């Protein structure tokens, strides 16, 4: 995990001092709301429905136990005892008082954390695979590259006021767990015929009001040119991106308007001036960053045969089958802590749970943990021989729901319960579906399904790329929900198709049940929901859901 140097620390401490003075001036009436707005947004502070919301940066989802304990303290002292994991791996507090935010930022700074560039029209947090560095299918560890990008993006003077917000994701594995195809820029490693490392570069992906699957504009970018090429992309976007209409200001609109081919030509024209210049990466620079991401002190361990434990503890066997993932090292396993038990808002943790997570990380995973864009937590380096003991502790702490990748592992934005932009509540819909599908035997029989819920068209819940997507809409002051099918955020991403007219809140669990019934009836052996949908199309689902008396 990257450790700040003196320069990094001074940056965030200076920012705290600046924002403390800006907040004081605003509260004293010396700054107008219009003047204060860009200042608070630069520090991750939104004004929500009932209170400010502070979004804390978690670079590429990496945390240590000390940082998590600080988050627990903030939740306890300044919030209502809760924190929320966002779909871009950050942490949000939904109830801080405005006058307390400078103190919160000061506490974050003591553990090398901040809220810089977590909002506003700037370069946001770079995200990646939650199993980066330990995945068995990994091509390269993407974390050093994420950190290189983070350092380049932080306080970049040319890109502080872009036409619109800008998000970068980097994948390092054969499977795309970073959803790179629906980001403004997506990067994935590739090697040429000579075995040299480079990146495939995608631009113009994104969700929100106008969802788009991005386009690859460079099939092999030498790693030395990575930052120069990103710089060139941002220069083109900054120059040609629209600023007269925020709904048409994202880079995806520009790429579509120009065509990917013309956009790539403009990027290459910028590269004529940048290639070989000061932004060219060197081996020494990559090594400087990479040394922060060396493996922990793994032991030489054999893989464990769990057959006896599985037979004696069926609950453990079920949990192990869903909530663990193969590790690159023998004798180790990556464990996902589910934040989706029935009756709990997806992605929420209490202050006590945060403290418990920190303790578990120290005992079982070298003191480190990760957040995922699916709004769960990962202990990436658990000894297989300790897995049963960990499971027992996770049950006590409320983290052992065996539903990772299943229907109730719902991605869900805070929705109308918190967000001033939402058209409808999201959390009650998630809870009603969780309660309807609370039978674990049936849940396991259904198999893998991505169900994503957004409270408005901004798509913070990624509903466009859910196998089943739910979007909250407003109909004459009443909350309704539009359903889409067939979305996919993995490799070969696709956007869901709208099923038909929207549904009332009370009908949503029934609607999902009917969709699942069609899948169960139509599936072939080992076929997932998305596979069945792709084979039979949307019509059988539509006919069942809208049938008058079915």
Please give the residue ranges for each predicted region.
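Peripheral terminal and linker regions in Fe-S/redox and tRNA-modifying enzymes
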Residues: 1-550
């Amino acid at each position: 995990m990257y450790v700040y140097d003196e320069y990094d620390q001074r940056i965030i401490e200076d920012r705290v001092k600046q924002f403390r003075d800006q907040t004081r001036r605003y509260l004293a009436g010396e700054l107008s709301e219009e003047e204060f707005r860009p200042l608070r947004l630069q520090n991750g502070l939104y004004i929500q429905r009932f209170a400010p919301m502070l979004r804390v940066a978690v670079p590429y989802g990496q945390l240590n136990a000390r940082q998590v304990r600080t988050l627990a303290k903030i939740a306890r002292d300044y919030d209502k005892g809760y924190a929320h994991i966002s779909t871009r791996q950050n942490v949000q507090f939904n109830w801080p008082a405005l006058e307390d935010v400078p103190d919160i930022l000061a506490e974050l700074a003591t553990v090398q954390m901040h809220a810089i560039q977590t909002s506003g029209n700037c370069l946001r947090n770079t995200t990646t695979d939650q199993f980066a560095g330990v995945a068995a299918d990994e091509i390269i560890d993407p974390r050093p590259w994420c950190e290189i990008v983070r350092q380049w993006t932080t306080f970049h003077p040319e890109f502080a006021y872009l036409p619109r917000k800008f998000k970068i994701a980097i994948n390092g594995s054969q499977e795309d767990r970073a959803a790179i195809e629906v980001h403004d820029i997506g990067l994935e490693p590739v090697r040429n015929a000579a075995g040299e490392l480079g990146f495939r570069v995608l631009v113009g992906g994104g969700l929100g009001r106008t969802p788009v699957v991005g386009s690859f504009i460079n099939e092999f970018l030498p790693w030395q040119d990575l930052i120069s090429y990103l710089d060139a992309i941002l220069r083109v976007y900054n120059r040609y991106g629209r600023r007269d209409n925020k709904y048409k200001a994202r880079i995806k609109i520009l790429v579509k308007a120009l065509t990917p081919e013309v956009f790539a030509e403009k990027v290459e024209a910028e590269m004529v001036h940048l290639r070989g210049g000061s932004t060219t990466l060197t081996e020494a620079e990559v090594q400087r960053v990479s040394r922060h991401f060396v493996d922990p002190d793994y032991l030489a361990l054999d893989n464990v045969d769990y057959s006896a434990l599985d037979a004696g503890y069926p609950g453990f066997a079920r949990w192990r089958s869903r909530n663990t993932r193969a590790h690159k090292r023998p004798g180790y396993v990556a464990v996902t802590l589910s934040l989706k038990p029935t009756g709990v808002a997806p992605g929420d943790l209490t202050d006590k749970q945060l403290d418990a997570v920190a303790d578990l990380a120290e005992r079982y995973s070298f003191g480190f943990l990760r957040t995922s864009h699916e709004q769960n937590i990962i202990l990436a380096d658990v000894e297989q021989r300790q897995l049963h003991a960990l499971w027992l502790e996770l049950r006590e702490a409320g983290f052992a729901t065996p539903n990772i990748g299943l229907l109730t592992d719902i991605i869900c934005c805070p929705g109308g319960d918190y967000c001033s932009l939402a058209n409808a509540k999201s959390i009650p819909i998630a809870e009603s579906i969780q309660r309807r599908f609370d039978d674990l035997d049936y849940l396991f029989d259904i198999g893998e399904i991505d169900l994503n819920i957004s409270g408005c068209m901004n798509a913070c819940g990624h509903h466009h790329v859910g196998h089943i997507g739910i979007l909250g809409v407003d109909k004459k002051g009443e909350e309704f929900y539009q359903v889409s099918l067939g979305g996919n955020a993995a490799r070969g991403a696709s956007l869901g198709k709208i099923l038909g007219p929207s549904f009332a809140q009370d009908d949503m669990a029934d609607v999902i049940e009917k969709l699942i019934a069609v899948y169960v009836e139509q599936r072939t052996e080992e076929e997932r929901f998305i596979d069945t949908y792709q084979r039979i199309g949307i019509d059988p689902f539509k006919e069942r859901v809208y049938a008058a008396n079915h």
